[in-house]
């Protein structure tokens, strides 16, 4: 049997990444050029800055990925690329590079949904069992996705306002923590207690929707009022109280989803899946089925996860023409409607 090699490109936000996947789930290389330091002084991602950085480094990422994988372009089977959702300018840089490379080397182009990439990063751990439920938690998305078979995604619940990762960054900014704030809030939370008892929105409703705007407002109001009165708040307890509320919401909705949709396993993926508090709660509270979480190196944005999702799409015969365009608001339901 001839080995299959898929080169994948990811540029949907502030990470420029190129990876090479061998056969079904063996990552030979996963080059990531991070822009975190460039955006830190702005307190968040600046789209124009992100696009310019992608342009500056993407060619080098291609070269490094092939060199590290010890392959030539002629060894490749296909090229995969994220075409949405994400920042339109950032997406277009990766798309242009991937399409040019595919055209120059006469390779098929595989379109990949960025969030499907996060979900399918779990494939590196081994074969997934279907149907499965997935909790996708990142800076831009909070979704419960029911996957009936490989490549068939159905959103059964999502946030009505901010994504959970965005909520972490917003309250982190209020506390004066550096961007991105998720990791530091998680670390501080482990040193504090749930003292402030923030609200947990829509916990008792039967639906699977999320909301974090009320939690953010309660946090900001508490912090502002304390400053006005000259009261000192304990940073560790603030973080612990915020994280406890977030995790209560995520766990409650996930448990409801598992009751409503027969599932053989739970996949938890996305940047926030790196949160140690979330991992601890999942291990403690969901014990009646397998919980699969990608390794930390595959939780943030990276092309390795895009390659793992692309392998599924390639097996299903999903390829795109070279007129494939960026879809910054791409949803799972429109995934194969290029």
Curated annotation (Swiss-Prot):
Gene that encodes the chain: tsaD
Protein name (database record): tRNA N6-adenosine threonylcarbamoyltransferase
Any one GO cellular component localisation term in the record: cytoplasm
Cofactor info, note text: Binds 1 Fe(2+) ion per subunit.
Family: Belongs to the KAE1 / TsaD family.
E.C. number(s) listed in UniProt: 2.3.1.234
InterPro entries cross-referenced by the UniProt entry: ATPase_NBD (IPR043129), Gcp-like_dom (IPR000905), KAE1/TsaD (IPR017861), TsaD (IPR022450)
Keyword Acyltransferase tagged: yes
Annotated catalysed reactions: L-threonylcarbamoyladenylate + adenosine(37) in tRNA = N(6)-L-threonylcarbamoyladenosine(37) in tRNA + AMP + H(+)
UniProt key word Cytoplasm: yes
Cofactor(s) in the UniProt record: Fe(2+)
Principal location: cytoplasm
Catalytic class of the enzyme: transferase
Keywords of this entry: Acyltransferase, Cytoplasm, Iron, Metal-binding, Transferase, tRNA processing
Location(s) in or outside the cell: Cytoplasm
MF annotations from Gene Ontology: iron ion binding; N(6)-L-threonylcarbamoyladenine synthase activity
Species in which this protein is naturally found: Streptococcus equi subsp. zooepidemicus (strain MGCS10565)
Binding site for Fe cation: 114, 118, 301
Biological process annotations from GO: tRNA threonylcarbamoyladenosine modification
Binding site for substrate: 136-140, 169, 182, 186, 275
Function: Required for the formation of a threonylcarbamoyl group on adenosine at position 37 (t(6)A37) in tRNAs that read codons beginning with adenine. Is involved in the transfer of the threonylcarbamoyl moiety of threonylcarbamoyl-AMP (TC-AMP) to the N6 group of A37, together with TsaE and TsaB. TsaD likely plays a direct catalytic role in this reaction.
């Amino acid at each position: 049997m001839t080995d299959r090699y898929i080169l994948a490109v990811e540029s949907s936000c502030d990470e420029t990444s190129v990876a090479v996947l061998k056969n079904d789930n063996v990552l030979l290389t996963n080059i990531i050029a991070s822009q975190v330091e460039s955006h830190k002084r702005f307190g968040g991602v600046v789209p124009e800055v992100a696009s310019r950085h992608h342009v500056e480094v993407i060619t080098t990422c291609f070269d490094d990925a092939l060199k590290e994988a010890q392959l030539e372009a002629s060894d490749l089977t296909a090229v995969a690329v994220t075409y949405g959702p994400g920042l339109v300018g950032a997406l277009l840089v990766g798309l242009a590079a991937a399409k040019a490379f595919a055209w120059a080397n006469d390779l098929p182009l595989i379109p990949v949904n960025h969030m499907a990439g996060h979900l399918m990063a779990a494939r590196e751990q081994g074969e997934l069992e279907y149907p499965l439920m997935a909790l996708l938690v990142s800076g831009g998305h909070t979704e419960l996705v029911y996957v009936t078979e490989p490549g068939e995604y159905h959103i059964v619940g999502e946030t009505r306002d901010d994504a959970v990762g965005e909520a972490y960054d917003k309250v982190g900014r209020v506390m004066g923590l550096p961007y991105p704030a998720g990791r530091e809030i998680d670390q501080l939370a482990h040193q504090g207690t749930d003292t402030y008892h923030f609200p947990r929105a829509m916990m008792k409703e039967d639906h699977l929707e999320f909301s974090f705007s009320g939690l953010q407002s309660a946090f900001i109001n508490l912090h502002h009022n304390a400053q006005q009165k000259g009261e000192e708040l304990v940073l560790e307890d603030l973080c612990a109280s915020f994280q406890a509320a977030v995790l209560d919401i995520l766990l409650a909705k996930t448990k409801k989803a598992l009751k409503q949709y027969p599932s053989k396993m739970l996949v938890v993926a996305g940047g926030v899946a790196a949160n140690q508090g979330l991992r601890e709660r999942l291990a403690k509270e969901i014990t009646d089925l397998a919980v699969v979480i990608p390794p930390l190196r595959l939780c943030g944005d990276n092309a390795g996860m895009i390659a793992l999702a692309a392998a599924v799409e390639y097996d299903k015969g999903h390829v795109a023409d070279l007129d494939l365009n960026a879809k910054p608001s791409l949803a799972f339901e429109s995934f194969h409607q290029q």
